[in-house]
Amino acid sequence: MAKKIVSDLDLKGKVVLERADFNVPLKDGKITNDNRIVQALPTIKYIIEQGGKLVLFSHLGKVKQESDKEGLTLKPVADALSEKLGKEVTFVPETRGKKLESAIKNLSEGDVLLVENTRFEDLDGKKESKNDPELGKYWASLGDVFVNDAFGTAHREHASNVGISTHLETAAGYLMEKEIKFIGGVVNDPHKPVVAILGGAKVSDKIGVIKNLVNIADKILIGGGMAYTFLKAQGKEIGLSLLEEDKIDFAKELLESNGDQIVLPVDAKVAKEFSNDAEITEVSIDNIPSDQEAMDVGPKTVELFSKELEGAHTVVWNGPMGVFEFSNFAQGTIGVCKAIANLKDATTIIGGGDSAAAAISLGFEDDFTHISTGGGASLEYLEGIELPGIKAINDK
């Protein structure tokens, strides 16, 4: 069933509550990456243009004690948002109370107000994170309709997403709509053939995703640290490479039942120490020295993976191929990025997290159909789990 989106709502003159994802990195009170603010702009601008009175909610970081508040205020976000919109954004340094209620009452059509960090409510019995029913009801009482545009927290049942949705007509913002379309599309109705590329350090992080994707993907290419548990399951010697002993049986069973679908590295870049300056050797996957660790897939693996990608109509990628933060071990990730970017007739999706950071930092941002804004949310969505934040959005 299709979900309501913001353009389905009548917004003129209404107080529109919106859950955005402004969980941006800060250093000394300055925003170091404003990507999440930029991604939120289309929905915000649409609500303003339609004459809505916009009240924005977001969390920022984890608030565990009173002293955390100072470094986790949303004031820098209000300033950045004001600059990007070219208009004043009223910032209310509270999450409830008369000051907030009065500021909302004084809003005119097209005005924007940002409420303080929703997780300040976690200091009193984790009211935000545990979806306290009274808090959700109170926040909902401040507005007429609700727009959820925070995919990054869609896998969480919090007062500021699910709690508010319980009491108000709820629609997805444009960013949330894109995530439902692309990540949801991979899971529910992909254009075949589908190739999934999985990387990153741990098999344990991706077990649910693998179990779901074997029913969807024609091929699953596995790189990154997680590949070595699979190679060990095949009986290969992996030296000091990353290994999850307790996942060998899972890998073995998967290779036995779905071996035709799974493609593993054929070579690797190995080193004696975990450092960018380490001496690098390229070896066949059968020749990893006992005193060395695989830090990246090798050129033959990039070639093999590129070949497997040819002809794919849908590609979903989650997790880098090696220690891409070290430039000497980024070639595998760059190679896969290039191979995906060169596909002509494919829908190409990065499922958030480290692979999204890698693609953006390596300059491939514009070469993908969609780069997800969610880390944990993307993974759970790819597992086929119905996310609470999406479930709470009204159907059309």
UniProtKB/Swiss-Prot annotation:
Catalytic activity: (2R)-3-phosphoglycerate + ATP = (2R)-3-phospho-glyceroyl phosphate + ADP
Annotated positions binding substrate: D21, F22, N23, R36, H59, L60, G61, K62, R119, R156
Classification of source organism: Bacteria, Bacillati, Bacillota, Bacilli, Bacillales
EC number: 2.7.2.3
Keyword terms: ATP-binding, Cytoplasm, Glycolysis, Kinase, Nucleotide-binding, Transferase
Protein name in the entry: Phosphoglycerate kinase
Gene: pgk
Family affiliation: Belongs to the phosphoglycerate kinase family.
Pathway: Carbohydrate degradation; glycolysis; pyruvate from D-glyceraldehyde 3-phosphate: step 2/5
Positions in coiled-coil regions: none
Oligomeric and partner information: Monomer.
Classification via HAMAP family: Phosphoglyc_kinase
Subcellular location: Cytoplasm
Binding residue positions for ATP: K206, E325, G352, G353, D354, S355
A Pfam short name: PGK
InterPro entries: Phosphoglycerate_kinase, Phosphoglycerate_kinase_N, Phosphoglycerate_kinase_sf
GO molecular function: ADP binding; ATP binding; phosphoglycerate kinase activity
Species the sequence originates in: Staphylococcus haemolyticus (strain JCSC1435)
One Gene Ontology cellular component: cytosol
